[in-house]
Amino acid sequence: MGVRVFSTDHQATSWRAQWLRNLNAMPDADAAFRSLHAFVTPLGFEYYAYTLRTSVPITRSHAVSWSNYPEAWLATYAARGYAECDPVLQFCQRGVSPLLWPQADKVGESDASYWADARACGLRHGWSQTVRDHRGIFGTFSLARSTERITEDALVVVEPEMIWLAQLVHATISNLVVAQLLPDAAAPLKDVERRTLHWTAEGKTVAEVAAILEMTERNVSFHIQNAVAKLNAANKTHAVVKAALLGLIPAIG
């Protein structure tokens, strides 16, 4: 597989520390993604991709992708509308287990054309991993190559590094774009506003929240309305849903 394997914990720690320093120095998401080439090659792969999906707005969530995939594949992917039925993204939305791309003889009928086109464009063997963070952002990181099948024995050696890289890529790139894609994730909610939304999310009425937090119903309504405004929500229900999906509740303490 042509991968770099570390013989000691100290070597692995130094390697990861260097990656962290390099990525943390990147000025934007595009630069951070381009820099991954130097990290991916030692793992034995030619191609890599990262797709970020937000959890809000629920009916029109944002999706942004970066890749160094062959131009032929990017053109085919767009022309055939594979974004709507991508089996990699569909699998990765259902969980966070790594996905080893299927071999030609193990592809389901519904996905046959997708994988045939991918292989024809040089993406013959690959692996994908999804990471989900506290803001409800999903990030799917993929590694691929045109030759040499990825064996189970090889994965035992290198997959821990691949999983760690997926987590690092997600943390780095999502942090660089979150202010643009999810400005409400940084909504300056006060602790009392979080607590009122927290108990509202549990189905409590204003009167019940007031009793729990030992304040007047008027104050509860006041704090909820402030939270609605800060989250750019349409109403109380919308604010609770957004706060939950963005990891702003439950309130701690």
Task: Identify the residue ranges that each predicted region occupies.
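Regulatory sensory and allosteric helical modules in signal-transduction proteins
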Residues: 67-110, 116-119
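Helix-loop-beta substructure at the N-terminus of cytosolic sensory domains
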Residues: 26-61
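Juxtadomain coupling helices with adjacent low-complexity linkers
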Residues: 2-22, 29, 141, 145-190
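Helix-to-coil/beta transition segments that act as allosteric "coupling" elements at the rims
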Residues: 112-136
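Basic, Lys/Arg-enriched C-terminal extension of HTH/homeodomain DNA-binding domains
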Residues: 229-253
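GAF sensory/regulatory domain recognition
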Residues: 52-76
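The N-cap/first-turn positions of alpha helices
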Residues: 192-196
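Recognition helix of helix-turn-helix DNA-binding domains
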Residues: 205-238
